[in-house]
């Protein structure tokens, strides 16, 4: 197992399953902190953008003074569900992009409403066994740029991708006991 004890990972703490992300990160040995301010953001080696409602999260990023700092944050980022939407440089339906850090186009709520949430065994590139992916009002990636690597698809739709030190998944890895997605994210710190 890798040693992540020297790293501090932030979890943007505006909405979403913050405590669940923190628990998974700490399970792997890294220090995890909730990020609500610029001073907290400046302490971290990497950042998780959790699920939530992306438009509300954008408003909260602006009101907290974090928006511009997040746009220029150049360390590893894992975006889950709404975090994926925040990372996209294009959103279907004409909505303006949020942080626009990844060359991807995203369809919001692509798998239906809250009642249509589901869990499925997902084959992820580099994983020997399927990952128990939890999809809740999940988006999917409808277009990728040439520099984006597809890590997983479900029913022909891209649901996990990588661009440089950015990982974006449509599902919620923090809602399972399987830490492989978070470990893949933490491995970005060693590259």
UniProtKB/Swiss-Prot annotation:
Keywords: Glutamine amidotransferase, Hydrolase, Lyase, Pyridoxal phosphate. GO terms for biological process: glutamine catabolic process; pyridoxal phosphate biosynthetic process; pyridoxine metabolic process. It catalyses: aldehydo-D-ribose 5-phosphate + D-glyceraldehyde 3-phosphate + L-glutamine = pyridoxal 5'-phosphate + L-glutamate + phosphate + 3 H2O + H(+); L-glutamine + H2O = L-glutamate + NH4(+). The active site is at 81 (nucleophile), 172 (charge relay system), 174 (charge relay system). Pathway: Cofactor biosynthesis; pyridoxal 5'-phosphate biosynthesis. Its EC number is 4.3.3.6, 3.5.1.2. L-glutamine binds at residues 52-54, 108, 136-137. GO terms for cellular component: cytosol; glutaminase complex. One of its GO terms (molecular function) is glutaminase activity. InterPro entries: Class_I_gatase-like, PdxT/SNO, PdxT/SNO_CS. In the presence of PdxS, forms a dodecamer of heterodimers. Only shows activity in the heterodimer. Catalyzes the hydrolysis of glutamine to glutamate and ammonia as part of the biosynthesis of pyridoxal 5'-phosphate. The resulting ammonia molecule is channeled to the active site of PdxS. Belongs to the glutaminase PdxT/SNO family. This is Pyridoxal 5'-phosphate synthase subunit PdxT. It comes from Actinobacillus pleuropneumoniae serotype 3 (strain JL03).
